[in-house]
């Protein structure tokens, strides 16, 4: 996904959960492939660390938002066709796909379907349950014929579930 798509998605999720901001503008996005098989174990550790190190007194400050933004950035890319090994296109095709995804994401986030996803996603109670869900939904995703529209639905569902679950786990950890 392109940076603007990540920002639109983050804004929609954060607005729906009344959180501040989610940032992910790190240079590692250029050097670290955003592919499930390569980075998911690291993202799983980042989720665990985020929850374990959450400081109730600081809340969702800029640093916390940036950390959650990194997690969500990778999750979104796991459900973006060009970031998966079976993508047949080249870099140019990848850029066109993400351009279409950017415009599609912007439009989708204004729909009733997007609002319904926000309302109905599950909030998991443990990192193990959450990462099991992510593995399962990614496995299902990999079996599909991919379209921009289908990617957007998976991205919004997965990312909203992750944020809702992480915030749920943090609330248990601190309160």
Residue ranges and their predicted role:
Residues 1-70, 75-175:
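N-terminal leader/auxiliary helical segments
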């Amino acid at each position: 996904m392109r940076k603007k798509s990540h920002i639109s998605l983050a804004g929609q999720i954060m607005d729906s959960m009344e959180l501040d901001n989610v940032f992910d503008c790190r240079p590692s996005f250029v050097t670290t492939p955003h592919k499930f098989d390569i980075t998911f174990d690291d993202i799983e550790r980042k989720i665990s660390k985020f929850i374990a190190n959450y400081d109730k007194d600081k809340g969702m400050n800029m640093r916390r938002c940036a950390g959650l933004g990194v997690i969500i950035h990778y999750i979104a890319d796991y459900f973006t066709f060009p970031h998966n090994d079976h993508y047949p296109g080249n870099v140019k095709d990848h850029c066109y796909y993400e351009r279409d995804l950017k415009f599609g994401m912007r439009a989708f986030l204004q729909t009733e379907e997007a609002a319904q996803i926000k309302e109905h996603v599950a909030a998991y109670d443990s990192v193990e349950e959450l990462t099991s869900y992510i593995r399962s939904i990614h496995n299902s995703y990999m079996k599909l014929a991919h379209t921009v529209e289908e990617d957007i639905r998976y991205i919004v569902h997965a990312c909203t579930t992750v944020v809702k679950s992480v915030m749920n786990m943090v609330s248990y950890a601190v309160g």
